[in-house]
Structures are given as C-alpha cells and as structure tokens.
C-alpha cells in the first residue's frame, strides 16, 4: 500500500499542472488547437485514475480550457467527484469548475443535492462557504426547493462569514423558488439588525433588490430602514436604503414628509458625490409625491437644484451626466426652478462628450416656453451648422422639431417663423431625417389653416429650386422634403401665385431621378394642380391657354409612364389617359374643369397614429379563426412566408415536419433562384416603395456625397428665420406697450405694486389666428392599449404579500426520518403533568416580559404608528393609528370596524386583561354545561344575556346587513359636471383639513381650464399657490374628457372648529365641443360640519372612565323619536358619518368616543328604546358639543 502511494506521488511529479498547460499553449501559437486537443486526451486519461489529487489537477486544467471557450460538459460527473473530496483545496477546485459549466440543463446536477447539503452542514466554515458560493452560480428550481431550509438555517450561524453568504444566496433561491420567500422573510428581516455590518449590508442588499421590482410588499419595513438610515455610517448601505425609499415614497405619501429632514441633512453634510446624488434623487421623488394639494417645499427644491448645478459644473463627465439626468426629473414638476439655469444647460451643448450634449438637449425640451422658444431654437440652429458628425446633427434636427411641435405646437406664436426654420433645415446635406422635416411641413400645413398660403408659397419656391435639394437621393435623405412640397402645392393649389410655373417645375425631366415614392406624389399632385389651372382658365374664358396646359401634360407624362417604379407607372398611365380624354373634349369645346376638379373635392384631415388599432371588433367576428383551414402538409413551400405587417408569433400549433438539413435547404433555395433567373416569364421581385421606406439604411450605409461648393447652399427666395425673430420681437414689444397703456388707464389714482410687470406665457398672443385641426379617430374607438407585462419576467412570481400570516401549506419542505410513535405510559404522563404544573409560574413571568418587549418592538415597527407624529395625551385615551380610512365608498359592518380597532390596539393590552379573558373562559365553560341541561324553549331568553363588549367588539347575534354608505356628499351639479366632496382631517395638523373633490364630466364636451375658488371667511381660508391673491382661484390639475371623473384635493386652514360653517364657492371651466368652446361657471356652498373635524380614535373603558370622572367636561343631550333601524346599524352610522369609535356596548346601550383635530375630547352614551334613541354627550367645549349633537340629530332622524 505504501509503495503504491509513493508510486502515485512520483507519477504526479511528471503530470502537467495548470502552469504547464498555460506555458504549452503560449509555446504552440501556430498549432494551438492541435495542442489543446492533445491536452484534452491526456486530461481524459487522468480523470480515469483513482487518485483524487490527479482528478483535481485535471479538473483545474479543464476549468481553464472552459474559459477559453472549450466545452467540458462531458466531464460533469468527474467534477462532482472532485466536489465530494474531503480535502478543501480539491473541493474548491470542484466547486469552481461546477460554477463555470453547470447550468439548468446539466443532467447530473441532481446528484449534487446531498453533497451540497453535507457541505452546508460541515463544521468547517470554509467548506460551507465554498458550497454556498458555488451553489449561487448553478442553483436550479429543484436545488432551491430541496436546500432552501438548510440555507435558511445557516442565516442563524454563529460565524458572520457564513451568515453573510447565506443571506446573499437566498436572493438566488427566491428567484428560482418563490414559495420560499414568505417562510424565509422573518429571518431575513432579523438580519437587518445583525451586529455584524457585513451581514447587515447583505440583508439590505437582498431586500432592496426584491423591493426594486415589487416595492408595495416591503412598505412595512419603512420604520426599520429609517432607523438604519439615521444610524448607519456606511455610504454603500445608505445609498441602497435611500434608493429603496425613493421607490416606496410614491406608495405612501406620509413617508415623504418623514424623509425630507434627514435627507436634506445628508445633502448638507455628505462629501460623497454618489450619496449626494442618491439623496437628491430621492428628495425629488418625495417632492413629486407631495406635490398634489400639499404646501410647497421650495427650499428643498432650490437646495437640490443648487447641488445638481455643482455636479453639472464638475469636471468629471460621469457626475455631469448624472446631474443633468436628475435635473430632468425636477423639470417635470418644478420647471421654473430649472429654467433659471438655462445658461448652464446651453453651455453643455458645447461639451466634447456627445452623451452629455444629448442629455442637455432632452432638458431643453422641457424648458421651452412661448417666451424663449425662438431664442433656444436659434441657439440650436447655430449648433447644427457647427456640428461634427451626422449622428449628433441628426439628433439636433430631431430635437428642434420635437421642441417646436410638442403639445400640439402650443409654444409657437408665429408659424411663419416655424415654416422658415423647416425650410432652413432643408439645407442640411447627409441627414437621415428628411422624412421628419417633410412630415412636419405636411402636419403644419394641414392643421394650421392660417399658414397655408405662406406654406404654399415657400413650397413652390422649394420645387423651383428642387435641383439643389434633389442632389441627395438616398432613402430618407433631404430630398424627402420634395414629397411634402409637391403634396402641399397640389392639395392647396388655390393659394399658389404662379400655378403654371409650379406645374412646369414638377414636370421637369430631372424629377425622374428622384426616388419612386416621391415621383408618385409628384404625378398625383400634378393632376390636382392641372385641375386648378384648368378651372382658372375656363373661368377667364381662355380656352387656348387651357389647351396648352393639357398639351404640356400629354408631352411630359410619358416620362413617368416609363418609370421603373410600378406605382409611378400606374398613376402616370391613368392620369395620361384622363388628360387625353380631356384633350378630346376640349377639342369639341366642352367645358371639363368642374368635372376634373370634382375628382379632388373635400379636405384631407390627419388621422391619429393608433386609429386602426382602436377600431372596435364587430360582434361575432373572431380574428383568430382560420378563414380557410390550412392544408395538412405543405411540401412546395420551403420557407416560412414573411409577416405582412409585423413579426407575428404563431398562435396555432401545426403538425411538426421533420427537420431538414440546413445545407440541403440552402442548396434547394439556390437552385430555385437559378431557375427563376433563367425563366424569361418570371417577374423579378423588387422591394416595394413602402417596404423600402421602412427599411432605412443605417448611418454606416449612407453614401458620402461631395458638395459642389460652387453651388450656393442658400435657396433663392427663401426667408431667413432671423428676420422673423426680429419681427416677432417688434410685435411683442408693440403688444406690451398697448397693454401698458391700458394698465395705466385702469391704475390711474391707484398705487402701482410693481414697476416692471413681467410677461407670462399666456400674455403672448399668437401672430396668426391658430385653429389646429385635431386627429381623426374611428367611431366607438377603444381605449389605448397597454403593453402586457413580460410573461418571462422572473420577478413576477416574487410579487407576494409578506404581511399575511404564514399558512401551514407554505412552510418549507424539510427532510425527516419516519419515526414510529412512542406509546406513552400513564406513569410518565403523570410525571410530565407534575413538572408542567411546577413550571407554570416561571413561564407566566417569561411570557409577560416577552410580551412587553414585543409590544415595544411592534409599536416601533408599525408603519401607521411610526408615521403618526402626535404624542398621546396624559390622562386621555391612548391614540392609535388613525382609522380615517373608514371614509371609503362603502362600509361592511361595525363588526368589521371594531375588529380593526381591536387589532390595532392589541399591542397595548396588558396582563390584567388576560385574567379577565381567563375568567370569561370559565364563565363560558359553565354556560355550556347549563346549556345542555336547559330545555330548548329557553334558548331565546338566554341569548339576551350578553356580556359587555369593549372597544367596539360586535354583538354575537346576527344582525341585518348594513346598507352601503358613502362619505362623499353632493356639492353641486349642472348638465356639464357633477361635483361631490368629502372633508378629511388629520391629527398631525391641528389647523388644516383637506377637501377631496370628485369632478365627473356628465356631458359630451371636453372640460378644461378648470379653476376652483372658495371665498375666505374670518375663520376658514383656502390655501392658494404662492403669489396668489385672495380672489384668485386654485387651478384643478387635470382635464376631463367626456364621461371621465377624477379627484382633486384642496387644503383649508381653520382657526376655530366649534361651529359649523358654509362657504360660497365657484367652479369655472371651459367646455369644448365640435361647435366651439364656452366658458361655464357653477356656484356652490361648501359645508364644513363639526363632525368633519373629528378623527376616529379608539379608547379603552378605563381611560374613558377617568375622562368622565375628571369633571372638566360640559354636558348636553338629545332624544330622537321614530327610529326603526337596528341598534347595530345605528352605531355603524354614527361611527361612519361622525367619526366615533365604540368603547363599550351592553345590550341596547353603548359608550362612544372621538377626538377633534384640536384635542377636544367627545364622549357619548347612546341608548335605544323601542322606537326612540337618546344621546347623552360630554365634551371639553360646550359649543362644539351642541353643534355635534345637532348634526347627529339630523343623521338619526333619517334612520
């Protein structure tokens, strides 16, 4: 045996190791493949040996070869053998090889389960660590399911090294086996408070990655992460947590208010640019979520913008890019804050880095207004001239057009200037966006009627100088503008000054060098122009001139008939025959102008891009059904036919045909093509104009065109945009002077508030009367399609509610030995019973301490409690999370409400109540015994003896169902709009209430420019935007299409809440329909009841009794007769409409409690008689109590 070992050791001395393999590959550069194949043969021999060291050496060399691209899957079994080695150095080699080449398709991977489980339970931390590292690379759903419990156990390992790796690999396990997330989550959550910073950061990383895709499931962890954020000094952990808060804030706006202060402190204090950027990013997300109806945080916005300016001015290009990226997010909600830094953004356009220039361009898009549009476009036009490289120049061109055309051209005040800009852009050579300029020319000419005359004159000039533009004839080149020019001159030919000249320009022989689709448009619009000229000549009784025009067409059209493009041929042939027919009729003296013009009667309006998609499918039409059943076998077709419109996924499965060899298919294809080429009767396929239009060549395929500098680049007769800029400035100056004169007349004798009045966008009137035609849609158009989520997304399965209690079926599978049940002897049972009894007092003490500790922990981790910043009153009931969510559209029953309150207060129950519950159990047991002995006819009498119910616990007997209730009341209604409202109070703000208003469009008109104004009283004032006067309204931040409703929130400041009050208000809006737009107003009275200032606050009977005994409360009472509603439903109505909670109920008597936003305590005792209800109330303010009881009387009278 010893000799054998010695011999094996000597043999290994002569084996090639990894260093020898690498050295050999370097020495055999000429025949590397041959050398490696020899080495692989040697390795195969080494793997057949029994010595594990030799095998490990062979696997090590195979791992290197795998990195060079060689397949080593054939050695998978040998790799598993090395993984199972007892020596760590060999085991590590095996796991490295497995992590390199094992995947879900590896057959032998199932053999690794027991080996990995054995290594995970190894006493050596290094064996466990290497197993965890390797498993993370090749984990499969089966491995994840089988090993999840073992890995979860390692999360509580004594060594931080193992805990950290176990926490990290759980993320991979969750992805492969999502069912393990819920059972493992409590332990993962514990690791957030691990004493080791490495384990803690690993847990933060895993949870942040999970929350990035499904943030709503991790909202309950916000208090814990907030604690980490304020205590951690690790920048990496802080960045992760701050990014997570950025995702959670839109889901819980209250969280944003809590985050503002610590985040701004971090922004001020941190020197790390990465942390600064993430803080700014999250503050932006917070402010976006708080922007609706809440007060401004202008200081925070200004701070963010200042810090981002520092980033943008930094010499580091990465920081500059990130600063511009974050600035674009602020721009969406606070554009004015960013617009003041326009100079800095424009400087970035001169940056060497193209990505920064492009990001600055994106920012300019949002910074544009009516005032600065011309200035920004002028700056961009100078960059177009200086731009190097077609890619950036094309991007500039696209951005100029996007900036001008955004929101239906709302920033353009002078469309003549815009047409001149588009014409100037036609001078660009080598651009790929000629079709974009052409599309804009067409769009503006069609939509803006006032500009058509000017547009036609410019397009005719463009057609006259077509030889300059047509020099670049590649697809999507600048010659595409001739497409638009020809169409506009033909469609709106009545505006042409010299139609004859334009017609001759369109019939020049050089036109035949243009692409086919442009020639086709030329031919089509030549006949439109011809019809217009014919009508003019006939009206002037100039028959000779009309015949000359006809003769011109007869002579020039044959050049188009001979075109290689089929569409041009077809159109030219049809029109030529039409013109020849007209010529015959002219020879006979028959007037034909009206009939020819009738061919082109009517206007062409733009069609919405998705109009075809939105056409509703008729009833009974199945678009997926076969029109003709497919043949069973298709032998003639070798290739799959191409989709006509887009790449379609096969929806119907067909019988699989046997796969044919690729070489055989290629050979057949070549033979068929050769046969077609030799066949004189076969028409060769050429790409259609539409297809060629779609397949635009890339930048690399654009041919380089030499510019003849002897030809002037400026098109004669074309206007310069600078002239229009000056004219526009003069026009605006005159407009300002006229307004100043009017203002001076009005303000005569009044004090002037501002010496230099600023000009807003709305003050700038357009140069022309703009009537923009909207896009046409089909009848009964369907709503826009939403892209379905990717069905292969691995994160979809991890969208799991983690707050729901764990069911038995969700526990992780654990391998167990089947044990036979041991039969317990009565003697042993007796001994165990004595032991249990003796341990009871100690257990009770432990349970009490644990419960107190859990109370504190739960209190800190409860999201609602944490977000509530109001401290509890000293001798008052303990305030819990606000249950104001009862103001939903319906309520199920007081039973449910009380259970909610009970659940929220469970954390505050002390062990005194346990004794109560034990006594209750004894009573219950005694009652059950008596129940068996009593006769059945006494059951009804027994049911009436109900024990007192605390904190709103519902009665045991079944009551009638509660009708649905809504907290929203009708505010006002007109044929156009219906307005309902609800007033919501909050404990956190003692002088503010939020009025939620739902606006529903009841008409067929489009409602826009909505504005709500409520007249302030001495007591109640509406919160308005900064700079607004008392008489200004608050704009509603949305528009209402027909049949749509939306909700807006408005904040009111209240001084005294003891009296109800009504405020007058007006809702003004513009109703736009096909006939035009009308300005409408709707008056209303906003009723602030005293109940709207109350907040549902749970209270225990002990605290309630102390409050009543204090003697500080005033008393009042009411009685209402004619009540037919059940007591349960009555309590539900009081709870819902007046925001009370049930403290205790006995039979037909209940004590109730509520609290106002200014801290007034309101206690009620509600008693129901046969047909009447009496309510005794006590409150810290007598006026508030009498007002509340009056409101309650009105509610009870309806019962």
From Swiss-Prot:
Organism ancestry: Eukaryota, Metazoa, Chordata, Craniata, Vertebrata
SUPFAM superfamilies tied to this protein: ARM repeat (SSF48371)
Record-given protein name: AP-3 complex subunit delta-1
Record's compositionally biased regions (Acidic residues): 773-790
A GO CC term attached to the entry: presynaptic endosome
Keyword DNA-binding: no
GO term, biological process aspect, one: protein localization to organelle
Gene3D superfamilies the UniProt entry points to: Leucine-rich Repeat Variant, Longin domain
Protein family according to the UniProt entry: Belongs to the adaptor complexes large subunit family.
Each HEAT repeat, start to end: 34-71, 142-179, 180-216, 218-254, 257-296, 298-336, 337-373, 375-409, 521-558
Topology in the lipid bilayer: Peripheral membrane protein
């Amino acid at each position: 045996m010893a000799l054998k070992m010695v011999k094996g050791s000597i043999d290994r001395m002569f084996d090639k190791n990894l260093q020898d393999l690498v050295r050999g590959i370097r020495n055999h550069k000429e025949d590397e493949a041959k050398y490696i194949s020899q080495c692989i043969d040697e390795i195969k021999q080494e793997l057949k040996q029994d010595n594990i060291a030799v095998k490990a050496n062979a696997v090590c060399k195979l791992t290197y070869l795998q990195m060079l691209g060689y397949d080593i899957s054939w050695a998978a079994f040998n790799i598993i053998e090395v993984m199972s080695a007892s020596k760590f150095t060999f085991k590590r080699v095996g796991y490295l090889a497995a992590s390199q080449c094992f995947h879900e398709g590896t057959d032998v991977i199932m053999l690794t389960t027991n080996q990995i489980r054995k290594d995970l339970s190894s006493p050596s931390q290094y064996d466990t660590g290497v197993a965890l590292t390797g498993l993370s690379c090749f984990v499969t759903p089966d491995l994840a399911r089988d090993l999840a419990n073992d890995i979860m156990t390692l999360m509580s390992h004594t060594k931080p090294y193992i805990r950290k790796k176990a926490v990290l690999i759980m993320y991979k396990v969750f992805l492969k086996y999502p069912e393990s997330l819920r059972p493992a989550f409590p332990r993962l959550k514990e690791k957030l408070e691990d004493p080791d910073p490495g384990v803690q950061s690993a847990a933060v990383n895993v949870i942040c990655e999970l929350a990035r895709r499904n943030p709503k499931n991790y909202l309950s962890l916000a208090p814990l992460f907030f604690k980490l954020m304020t205590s951690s000094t690790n920048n990496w952990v802080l960045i992760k947590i701050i990014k997570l808060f950025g995702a959670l804030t839109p889901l819980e706006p209250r969280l944003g208010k809590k985050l503002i202060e610590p985040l701004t402190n971090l922004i001020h204090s941190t020197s790390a640019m990465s942390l600064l950027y993430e803080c700014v990013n999250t503050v932006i997300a917070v402010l976006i979520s708080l922007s609706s109806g809440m007060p401004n945080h202008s200081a925070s916005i200004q701070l963010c913008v200042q810090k981002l300016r520092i980033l943008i001015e930094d010499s580091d290009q990465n920081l500059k890019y990130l600063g511009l990226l974050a600035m674009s997010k602020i721009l969406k909600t606070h554009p004015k804050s960013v617009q003041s830094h326009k100079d800095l953004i424009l400087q970035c356009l001169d940056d060497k880095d193209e990505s920064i220039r492009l990001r600055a361009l994106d920012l300019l898009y949002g910074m544009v207004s009516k005032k600065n549009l011309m200035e920004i476009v002028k700056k961009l036009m100078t960059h177009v001239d200086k731009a190097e490289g077609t890619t950036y120049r094309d991007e500039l061109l696209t951005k100029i057009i996007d900036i001008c055309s955004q929101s239906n051209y709302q920033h353009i005040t002078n469309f003549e200037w815009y047409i001149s800009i588009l014409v100037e852009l036609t001078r660009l050579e080598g651009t790929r966006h000629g079709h974009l300029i052409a599309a804009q020319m067409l769009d503006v000419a069609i939509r803006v009627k006032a500009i058509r005359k000017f547009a036609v004159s410019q397009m005719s000039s463009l057609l006259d100088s077509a030889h300059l533009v047509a020099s670049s004839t590649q697809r999507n080149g600048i010659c595409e503008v001739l497409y638009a020019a020809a169409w506009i001159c033909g469609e709106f030919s009545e505006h042409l000054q010299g139609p004859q000249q334009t017609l001759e320009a369109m019939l020049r022989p050089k036109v035949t060098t243009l692409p086919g689709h442009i020639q086709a448009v030329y031919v089509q619009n030549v006949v439109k122009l011809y019809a217009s000229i014919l009508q003019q000549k006939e009206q002037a009784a100039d028959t000779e001139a009309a015949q000359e025009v006809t003769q011109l067409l007869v002579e020039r059209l044959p050049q188009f008939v001979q075109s290689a493009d089929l569409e041009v041929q077809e159109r030219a042939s049809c029109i030529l025959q039409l013109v020849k027919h007209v010529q015959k009729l002219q020879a006979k003296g028959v007037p034909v102008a009206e009939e020819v013009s009738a061919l082109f009667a009517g206007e062409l309006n733009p069609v919405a891009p998705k109009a075809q998609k939105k056409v509703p499918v008729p009833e009974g039409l199945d678009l997926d059904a076969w029109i003709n059943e497919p043949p069973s076998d298709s032998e003639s077709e070798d290739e799959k036919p191409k989709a006509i419109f887009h790449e379609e996924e096969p929806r119907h499965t067909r019988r699989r045909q046997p796969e044919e060899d690729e070489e055989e298919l290629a050979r057949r294809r070549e033979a068929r093509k050769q046969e077609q080429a030799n066949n004189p009767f076969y028409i060769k396929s050429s790409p259609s104009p539409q297809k060629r239009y779609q397949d635009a060549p890339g930048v690399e395929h654009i041919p380089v065109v030499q510019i003849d500098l002897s030809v002037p680049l400026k098109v004669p007769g074309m206007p310069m945009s600078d002239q229009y800029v000056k004219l526009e400035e003069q026009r605006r100056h005159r407009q300002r002077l006229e307004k100043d004169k009017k203002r001076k007349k009005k303000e005569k004798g009044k004090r002037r508030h501002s010496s230099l009045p600023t000009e807003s966008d709305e003050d700038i009137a357009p140069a022309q009367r703009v009537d923009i035609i909207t896009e046409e849609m089909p009848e009964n158009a369907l709503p826009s399609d939403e892209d379905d989520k990717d069905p292969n997304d691995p994160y979809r399965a991890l969208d799991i509610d983690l707050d729901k209690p764990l069911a038995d079926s969700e526990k992780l599978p654990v391998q167990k030995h089947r044990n036979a049940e041991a039969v317990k002897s009565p003697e042993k049972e007796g001994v165990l019973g004595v032991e249990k009894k003796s341990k009871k007092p100690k257990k009770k003490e432990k349970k009490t301490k644990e419960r107190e500790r859990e109370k504190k922990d739960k209190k800190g981790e409860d999201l609602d409690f944490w977000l509530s910043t109001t401290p509890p009153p000293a001798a008052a009931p303990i305030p819990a999370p606000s249950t104001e969510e009862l103001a939903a559209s319906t309520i199920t029953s007081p039973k449910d409400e009380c259970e909610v309150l009970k659940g929220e207060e469970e954390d505050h129950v002390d062990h005194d109540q346990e004794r109560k519950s034990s006594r209750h159990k004894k009573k219950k047991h005694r009652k059950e015994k008596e129940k068996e002995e009593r006769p059945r006819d006494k059951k009804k009498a027994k049911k009436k003896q109900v024990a007192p119910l605390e904190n709103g616990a519902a009665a045991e007997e079944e009551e009638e169902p509660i009708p649905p209730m809504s907290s929203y009341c009708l505010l006002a209604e007109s044929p156009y709009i219906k307005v309902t409202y609800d007033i919501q109070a909050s404990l956190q703000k003692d002088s503010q209430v939020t009025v939620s208003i739902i606006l529903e469009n009841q008409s067929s008109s489009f409602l826009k420019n909505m504005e709500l104004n409520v007249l302030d009283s001495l007591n109640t004032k509406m919160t308005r935007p900064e700079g607004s006067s008392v008489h200004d309204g608050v704009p509603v931040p949305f528009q209402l299409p027909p049949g749509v409703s939306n909700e807006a929130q408005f904040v009111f400041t209240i001084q005294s809440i003891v009296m109800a009050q009504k405020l007058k208000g007006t809702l003004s809006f513009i109703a736009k329909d096909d006939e035009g737009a009308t300005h409408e107003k709707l008056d209303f009275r906003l009723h602030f009841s005293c109940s709207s200032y109350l907040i549902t606050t749970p209270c225990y009977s002990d605290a309630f009794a102390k409050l009543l005994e204090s003697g500080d409360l005033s008393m009042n009472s009411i009685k209402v007769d004619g009540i037919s509603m059940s007591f349960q439903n009555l309590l539900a109505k009081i709870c819902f409409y007046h925001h009370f909670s049930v403290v205790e109920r006995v039979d037909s008597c209940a004590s109730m409690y509520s609290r106002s936003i200014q801290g007034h305590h309101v206690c009620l005792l509600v008693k129901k008689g046969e047909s009447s209800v009496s309510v005794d109330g006590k409150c810290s303010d007598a006026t508030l109590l009498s007002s509340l009881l009056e409101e309650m009387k009105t509610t009870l009278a309806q019962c």
